[in-house]
Design a protein with these regions (language model features):
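Serine-esterase "nucleophile elbow" of acetyl-processing enzymes
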Residues: 1-50, 60-68
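Residue-level detector of flexible, active-site-proximal loop/helix-junction positions
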Residues: 14, 51-53, 120, 162
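Alpha-helical cap/lid subdomain in secreted, periplasmic
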Residues: 40, 59-201
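Short N-terminal helix/helix-N-cap motif within the alpha/beta-hydrolase-1
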Residues: 18-19, 55, 84
Length: 201
């Protein structure tokens, strides 16, 4: 059995798990899967709220009761910047600020931090395959991927999974907009778990 690790997840509705039970949030599902591989997780600390932009997450972190260092830190943010029509050019400096904080929370060890792509809410009943939404999500994710590359941290792409939401209705929560617990499980099992297990070896 390995030593227990602590996990800090930073984000918005996609991290707090809007419209799903707490145990179905992807950070909680990841912790359970890690424990199945003999990696206990002592704490899952989530700083996230539905509707938060990068600026609001920054303020939320300042107000949060945190106990760093954390062994693992995730960052999934940006959909609400896109949804509110903020210029994608303003996203990079705000994302870099948050990523630098995430690295600091990981004892200044970037190898313990990962970025998760923004899911595409176009593929939900609420938006019905909107091309303009998908284009906006692609633009934001391109910035996020570049920042991850520049900082040498993993960029985990779950966007393609989210794009199955119209063909597989069970991947969308009852609100017709957010991912279901089943979709979050696919994020973990198909993409996140593999990367994180390599990170904590």
């Amino acid at each position: 059995m390995n030593e227990p690790i602590s996990f800090l997840a930073l984000g918005d509705s996609y991290t707090i798990g809007e419209a799903v039970d707490e145990d179905q949030r992807w950070p909680n599902q990841l912790a359970r899967r890690l424990e199945e591989f003999d990696q206990p997780v002592s704490e899952v600390k989530i700083v996230a709220r539905t509707g938060w932009t990068t600026t609001e997450l920054d303020a939320g972190i300042a107000d949060a009761d945190l106990s760093p260092p954390y062994d693992l830190v995730s960052l999934l943010i940006g959909v609400n910047d896109q949804f509110r029509g903020l210029d994608v050019a303003t996203y990079r400096p705000k994302l870099e600020n948050l990523l630098n904080q995430a690295i600091a929370f990981a004892d200044n060890d970037a190898s313990r931090v990962f970025l998760v792509s923004i899911p595409d809410y176009a593929f939900t009943p609420s938006f019905g395959g909107s091309t303009s939404v998908s284009q906006g999500i692609n633009a934001y994710n391109a910035v996020k991927a570049q920042v991850a590359n520049d900082y040498n941290v993993p960029f985990i792409n779950i966007t393609n999974i989210s794009r199955r939401g119209l063909e597989t209705p069970s991947l969308v929560a009852g609100d017709g907009l957010h991912p279901s617990g089943e979709q979050y499980q696919r994020w973990v099992d198909e993409e996140i778990l593999r990367v994180v297990r390599e990170m904590i070896r």
